[in-house]
């Protein structure tokens, strides 16, 4: 999920949706979906949206509730899916698994104690994106004719690359600050929140701190990334000062007598990640509302009332824009 401390360095400002109308946004699908999945579960409980065979489908409710935000503001989302995870993330994944297991134990305790509020909070934290969640969400997006891209590796890296190199893509969409290290020129954050999004500007960040892209990545590595734990005593300010004094990661490490395992590889994962140009984006989407609704409510047994408003909003936005891409 990246290092949230990087916010202290990032050039970020709130941006009205009116300024974004007509834009194409390459969305980190994992990041976006997980936010809606956990929010749905926290407010309703995972058991509320479970099929007769025990399959959890809260993701479908979350997706239907979250998509109208794009459509109502004239944005075309392109959801970019992870194709694989680098081996350097193994430790991070193991840590998350252990943390989830701790939450599951605490969840059992909260349920036994009858603490509904604490149980709801912990239930949300135990969620993970299962293969079924991925498959059902993708099929829903297909029915709604929403563009999707399969990344060869990290979806966020692919989204950043598309924003940087493809004139058809205007913004990346992710709450993960790694988009900054990955060189996304402009990233929209808080797309799952109720207000206007935040715009994170890559060039403005570099200019504000007199950094090169490589040096920004070095600052991130010193603070810690999904691929390394960081160096003790280094936060954004101290890392920035150290890079300013010594020039790059290697000279800082030499001066501090420190070492970052796989440092070269980690640097390359941000500067030259595994990405592809083998994708097609068609912004002229034609959502099949009835088919999508039937998929969610009939095939996956979601209560029709839970998604009625979401589908109504998508349908209304498609009709109101008067643009070819929504008709």
UniProtKB/Swiss-Prot annotation:
Q: What is its EC number?
A: 3.1.-.-
Q: What is the superkingdom listed in this entry's lineage?
A: Archaea
For this UniProt record, give its keywords in alphabetical order, as a comma-separated list.
DNA damage, DNA repair, DNA replication, Endonuclease, Exonuclease, Hydrolase, Magnesium, Metal-binding, Nuclease
In terms of InterPro entries, this protein maps to: 5-3_exonuclease_C_sf, Flap_endonuc, Flap_endonuc_arc, HhH2, PIN-like_dom_sf, XPG-I_dom, XPG/Rad2, XPG_CS
- Residue positions annotated to bind Mg(2+) 2 are 176, 178, 226
Q: Which cofactor does it need?
A: Mg(2+)
Q: How is the cofactor bound?
A: Binds 2 magnesium ions per subunit. They probably participate in the reaction catalyzed by the enzyme. May bind an additional third magnesium ion after substrate binding.
Annotated Mg(2+) 1 binding lies at 28, 82, 154, 156
| Residue ranges of the region described as I-domain | 118-247
SMART domains per record:
HhH2, XPGI, XPGN
| Pfam families (alphabetical) | XPG_I, XPG_N
The family database entries (HAMAP family) matched by this protein are listed as:
Fen
The UniProt entry's sequence similarity note says: Belongs to the XPG/RAD2 endonuclease family. FEN1 subfamily.
The UniProt function text for this chain reads: Structure-specific nuclease with 5'-flap endonuclease and 5'-3' exonuclease activities involved in DNA replication and repair. During DNA replication, cleaves the 5'-overhanging flap structure that is generated by displacement synthesis when DNA polymerase encounters the 5'-end of a downstream Okazaki fragment. Binds the unpaired 3'-DNA end and kinks the DNA to facilitate 5' cleavage specificity. Cleaves one nucleotide into the double-stranded DNA from the junction in flap DNA, leaving a nick for ligation. Also involved in the base excision repair (BER) pathway.
Identify this protein by name: Flap endonuclease 1
| Record organism | Halobacterium salinarum (strain ATCC 700922 / JCM 11081 / NRC-1)
Q: Which gene encodes it?
A: fen
